[in-house]
Amino acid sequence: MRFGIIAALAASLPFTTAYWKGFNIGANNADGSCKTTAQWAEAFNKLKGLPQYITSVRTYATSDCNTLANAVPAALSTKTQILVGVWAEDLAHFEAEKQALLDAISAHGSDWIIAITVGSEDLYRKDSDPNTIATRINDVRGMVRSVGVQASVGHVDTWTAWVDGANEVVIKASDFIGMDG
């Protein structure tokens, strides 16, 4: 498929929230240990202290290091919103990610969710095929809709992934697409 058709398809996605300013934050400290809720809150408050007053972050996973179990209470206490990353590789890991997201929604509602990204750079790295990513996007969307969450669900990848016609199925499955530059 030609670039123009892919670009037109991507352009047809809704742009109601076309831009977020935030930081990607991992669940591990520099020494490899997992962040505690207090450490998440400290990180969120540091971001708010920047001249840009950053109040949104992106996580890479939900279950690793109890990411959401520790980050969501900190996000709520600091008024930080999260672009939730759900790891899409490895079915067992993906299922654990979904459960961690459901647990966080059950415990804290969904006001802290900006949107949900299923996978990150999977297409660029060729870690998963496009049909698998599309299926997992639809799976997560169905799961969160079943508990009343209306957050957009999509995928983040490099620009080269978005202009590759083989990945059209992912664009079609997504409420939004994100780009790592």
PLM regions and their residue ranges:
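Active-site groove signature of glycoside hydrolases
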Residues: A107-D129, V156
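Aromatic-lined carbohydrate-recognition surfaces of secreted/lumenal glycan-active proteins
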Residues: V144-V163
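An active-site-proximal structural segment forming one wall of the substrate-binding cleft
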Residues: H93-A115, R136-M143, V170
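Aromatic- and acid-rich polysaccharide-binding/catalytic face
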Residues: I114, S120, D157-G181
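Fungal secretory targeting signals
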Residues: M1-W20
